[in-house]
């Protein structure tokens, strides 16, 4: 019997089972122990293959693919720390709902805890972060093929959101020619090989029912809070709120068009907070709010009813409101809860939102990151999408910009880390094939510099704007100790990214005013492939501009 041949047949069943659950994209890192999985994936024509030498970046590439495709994405890595490098992407997927299937090759049990090379304790290593965990045995013909395929089906069929960790031990030899070993074992599955359905099918029914008293609450004074949702849902939410006559507080990831722009500015005004206190019901559609003032208001508001609608399970409400947690997609919830045409009840808030927007526009002439955030709408590619990094840049765009309704916006706002942002943006672009504008800070770019390699395969124009304010300037907005702030919080690196772009063969520009930025972007959207545009800005201007606008709007 050929061990290497049966390893591959075992892996082929696993990979074929994944295709029955909508897996098209598969991300593969180099490794020897993962050879059976890699070769099985390479031979399966149902897959679109993606490769990367860095497992941490590979995990985030898969995360971006899952975000834009809205399909489960598989990842193959070898044993040891290669597996551990998937942890950040898995954590993010668990918090934002993307389905990642991690196939981690492993040493067989007899090589664990005995000093064998590249052998760590992988079963259960991700603790509670995966939605499902499967620790497979070593491949054996004594285990029926139908057990293997039904084990995969059970886990994926029950997967509502988040990751699945499938640990796959393989014994050596891993290489060799294929022979007839395991053919009869595979044939136990009969016509399954010719079908496109799972071996084990199960229905996943998790959505909440229609709220029978909605007809009553829709006649009251309400507020709509829009968190993370799809572009199509964002447009529908904006129309729904307008019909109800309820003010809409739209997050940067809501894709609602933010009809009341600059919410994170005007929520610092006492008049707005007083008017919102008259609301009898707050309906929050989507989680993961960004703005600090939005979160502060959300934490202190006390309506008669607080409803939170999201298709992810769990509370998702750090303020622990008394109310209803409704498990549903936003689109389905809107279908079940139609709006009734009513006159707007809030009069102060629209005025404040308009004044806040005018204040932001009036401050947009100097060349800086706050001004870039306010102007961002004019730089979006037609029929494209926006990927927003974390830390200061996402807060500036959330507070100062007004994005088009229904324009796709992506970000990693689950755990809100600065790791893997370039890789995630690359995955979003690959899955959608749209022109993509991605914006990250300089520390985020340094953290994920390896992933510039992934941008070389962009299928449509991709522009990565690196806002270089020389460090983590978000900490200048926090009460960090003055004497220790620069060394221990801001950590300026005094770098530019020209050589990084050259190393990976990417086009590079470093504009120093708005006309030169306009010119660089116009050229980037006309050429195929990726372009890095570095904006070297004054270190403190972005944070100071935001603080000045907050103070100005609070006095209106």
Curated annotation (Swiss-Prot):
Its EC number is 2.2.1.9. The keyword Manganese applies. One of its GO terms (biological process) is menaquinone biosynthetic process. It catalyses: isochorismate + 2-oxoglutarate + H(+) = 5-enolpyruvoyl-6-hydroxy-2-succinyl-cyclohex-3-ene-1-carboxylate + CO2. Pathway: Quinol/quinone metabolism; 1,4-dihydroxy-2-naphthoate biosynthesis; 1,4-dihydroxy-2-naphthoate from chorismate: step 2/7; Quinol/quinone metabolism; menaquinone biosynthesis. It comes from the Bacteria. Keywords: Magnesium, Manganese, Menaquinone biosynthesis, Metal-binding, Thiamine pyrophosphate, Transferase. The keyword Transferase applies. One of its GO terms (molecular function) is thiamine pyrophosphate binding. Binds 1 thiamine pyrophosphate per subunit. NCBIfam families: menD (TIGR00173). Homodimer. Catalyzes the thiamine diphosphate-dependent decarboxylation of 2-oxoglutarate and the subsequent addition of the resulting succinic semialdehyde-thiamine pyrophosphate anion to isochorismate to yield 2-succinyl-5-enolpyruvyl-6-hydroxy-3-cyclohexene-1-carboxylate (SEPHCHC). PANTHER family: 2-SUCCINYL-5-ENOLPYRUVYL-6-HYDROXY-3-CYCLOHEXENE-1-CARBOXYLATE SYNTHASE (PTHR42916), PROTEIN PHYLLO, CHLOROPLASTIC (PTHR42916:SF1). Belongs to the TPP enzyme family. MenD subfamily. This is 2-succinyl-5-enolpyruvyl-6-hydroxy-3-cyclohexene-1-carboxylate synthase. The gene is menD.
């Amino acid at each position: 019997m050929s061990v290497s041949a049966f390893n591959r047949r075992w892996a082929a069943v696993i990979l074929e089972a994944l295709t029955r659950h909508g897996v098209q994209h598969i991300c593969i890192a180099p490794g020897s122990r993962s050879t059976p999985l890699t070769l099985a994936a390479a031979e399966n024509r149902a897959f679109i293959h993606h490769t990367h030498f860095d497992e941490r970046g590979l995990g985030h590439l898969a995360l971006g693919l899952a975000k834009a495709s809205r399909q489960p994405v598989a990842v193959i890595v070898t044993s040891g720390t290669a597996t551990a490098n998937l942890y950040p992407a898995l954590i993010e997927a668990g918090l934002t709902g993307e389905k990642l299937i991690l196939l981690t090759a492993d040493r067989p049990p007899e090589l664990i805890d005995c000093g064998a090379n590249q052998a760590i304790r992988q079963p259960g290593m991700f603790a509670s972060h995966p939605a499902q965990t499967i620790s497979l045995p070593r491949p054996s013909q004594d285990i029926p093929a139908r057990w293997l395929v039904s084990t995969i089906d059970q886990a994926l069929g029950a997967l509502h959101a988040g990751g699945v960790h499938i640990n796959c031990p393989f014994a050596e030899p891993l290489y060799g020619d294929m022979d007839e070993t395991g053919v009869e074992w595979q044939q136990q599955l009969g016509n399954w090989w010719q079908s496109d359905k799972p071996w084990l099918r199960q229905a996943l029914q998790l959505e909440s029912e229609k709220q029978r008293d909605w007809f009553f609450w829709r006649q009251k004074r309400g507020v709509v809070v829009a968190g993370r949702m799809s572009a199509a849902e964002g447009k529908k939410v904006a129309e729904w709120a307008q019909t109800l006559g309820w003010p809409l507080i739209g997050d940067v990831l809501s894709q609602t068009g933010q009809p009341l722009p600059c919410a994170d500015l005007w929520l610092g005004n006492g008049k707005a907070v007083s008017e919102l206190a008259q609301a009898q019901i707050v309906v929050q559609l989507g989680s993961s709010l960004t703005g600090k003032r939005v979160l502060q208001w959300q934490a202190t508001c006390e309506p008669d009813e607080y409803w939170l609608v999201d298709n992810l399970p769990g509370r998702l409400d750090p303020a622990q409101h008394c109310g209803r947690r409704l498990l549903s997609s936003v689109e389905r919830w809107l279908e079940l809860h139609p709006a009734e045409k009513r006159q707007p009840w809030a009069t102060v808030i629209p005025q404040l939102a308009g004044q806040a927007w005018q204040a932001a526009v009036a401050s947009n002439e100097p060349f800086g990151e706050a001004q870039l955030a306010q102007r961002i709408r004019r730089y979006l590619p037609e029929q494209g999408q926006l990927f927003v990094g974390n830390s200061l840049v996402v807060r500036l765009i959330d507070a100062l910009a007004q994005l088009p309704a229904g324009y796709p916006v992506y970000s990693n706002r689950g755990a809100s880390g600065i790791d893997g942002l370039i890789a995630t943006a690359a995955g979003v672009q690959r899955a959608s094939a749209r022109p993509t504008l991605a914006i990250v800070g300089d520390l985020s770019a340094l953290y994920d510099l390896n992933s510039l390699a992934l941008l070389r395969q962009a299928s449509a124009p991709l522009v990565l704007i690196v806002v270089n304010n020389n460090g983590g300037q978000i900490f200048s907005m926090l009460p960090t100790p003055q004497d220790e702030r620069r060394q221990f919080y801001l950590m300026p690196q005094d770098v530019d990214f020209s050589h990084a772009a050259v190393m990976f063969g990417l086009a590079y520009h470093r504009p120093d005013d708005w006309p030169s930025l306009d010119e660089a972007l116009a050229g980037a959207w006309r050429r195929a492939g990726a372009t890095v545009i570095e904006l070297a800005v004054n270190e403190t201007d972005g944070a100071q501009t935001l603080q000045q606008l907050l103070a100005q709007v609070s006095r209106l």
